[in-house]
């Protein structure tokens, strides 16, 4: 009997946060106010893109209380799926606000171990979600260069045309920090702003610092 094996899959986790509406109502007005007041504000690393960033400290800290537990649970669920030993970690992150012309170039989040994106204000019919590139790029490029490109939807070069990977407003996704990704400009010109929260997860102590993940 013949078999096909899809070896070395890339784990991407998605969950819709139940307290999304509350967090959006608190955070988006403040972020839009900052965006209009300081339209050129962006991170130092954002030199090859048309983007805008603000730090966690740019909004009232207690705004995070309504989603903090859900984010931590998602991180621990992702760690359990990966089979990671319990460890202490820190989260570092920032907000992104884009109008329909703005974009983020191809990048990854090394040296973090994995990263997250939370879609706070997002119109899936008009805005673009993050596009992930297939880590097996060498093989795919070889096939395309040999004029026999792969068309199997499980082996695409990126997730742009993956109809199974559709993001909704309120979704949080977690993915390996080494996974290359980009954010194109919006699918069409429109007046609403796209607002996301990006963060990295980095170990800060010995893997033996915690006996087990919380249940």
List where the protein language model places each region:
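Non-heme Fe(II)/2-oxoglutarate
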Residues: 1-82, 103
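Short, proline-centered helix/strand-breaking motifs
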Residues: 174-179
């Amino acid at each position: 009997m013949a078999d096909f094996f899809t070896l070395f899959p890339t784990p991407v986790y998605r969950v819709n946060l139940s307290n999304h509406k509350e967090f959006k109502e608190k955070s988006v007005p403040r972020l839009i106010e900052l965006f209009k007041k300081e339209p050129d504000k962006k991170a130092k690393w954002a030199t090859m893109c048309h983007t805008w960033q603000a730090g966690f400290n740019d909004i009232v800290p207690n705004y995070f209380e309504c989603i903090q537990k859900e984010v931590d649970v998602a991180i621990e669920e992702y760690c359990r799926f990966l089979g990671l030993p319990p460890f202490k970690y820190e989260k570092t992150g920032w907000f992104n606000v884009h109008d329909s012309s703005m974009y983020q170039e191809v990048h990854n989040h090394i040296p973090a171990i994995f990263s997250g994106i939370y879609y706070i204000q997002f119109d899936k019919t008009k805005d673009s979600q993050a596009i992930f590139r297939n880590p097996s790029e060498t093989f795919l490029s070889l096939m395309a260069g040999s004029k026999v490109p792969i068309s199997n939807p499980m082996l695409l070069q990126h997730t742009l045309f993956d109809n199974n990977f559709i993001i909704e407003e309120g979704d949080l996704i977690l993915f390996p920090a080494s996974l290359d990704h980009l954010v194109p400009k919006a699918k069409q010109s429109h007046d609403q702003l796209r607002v996301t929260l990006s963060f990295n997860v980095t170990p800060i102590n010995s893997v033996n610092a915690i006996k087990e993940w919380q249940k």
